[in-house]
Amino acid sequence: MRSGRRLFPLLLLALLPLALLPGLCHGREPAPGAVTCGSVLKLLNTRHSVRLHSHEVKYGSGSGQQSVTGVEASDDANSYWRIRGKSDSSCQRGTPVKCGQAIRLTHVNTGKNLHTHHFPSPLSNNQEVSAFGDDGEGDDLDFWIVQCSGTYWEREDAVRFKHVGTEVFLSITGEQYGHPIRGQREVHGMPAANHHNYWKAMEGVFIKPSLDPAKHDEL
């Protein structure tokens, strides 16, 4: 009997590291703060405190495509983006987005994808970032790699988005537009990783993370 009492604390110590493994006691699911496929959110540039934004205003130069800007207002409905994979099958609704995964960001109100290409941006002469496509379908220049430090993209983390096709980072350096979008900031691509290209998930509708896409709900 005494032998059994001595073994019980040892057994607890042996099991403790297993209990601390993320998701082990929850069907191996990631932490509830993981950003998931299908979620709709706003993205804040942490350096300049503006949210990624688009609208039915086209660039007057460069590609002439729909412009992408940064806005200070937190309640602007044109700042919502849907998280999607390179294909819908590669990023099923409720699946947590992994660090290093390629995604698409689809503008909710216009159905166009975050996009960049070899046109100069109008204010800083960096690489133009636009919104492109119809009903969520564009081309191979709509893909962005989520750069973060853990296993999954967590909502509280500052992350970078690196463009697959041209290897620039989604950035803001503070240049402001005049009429008709006065005060909005230029969004562009920069070749170097720096403090201008950190983004954080903010307001939105987040699908509860699950490694089983059949099991999900909204937070």
Task: Give residue spans per PLM region.
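Lectin-like carbohydrate-binding module/patch detector with strong preference for beta-trefoil
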Residues: 2-219
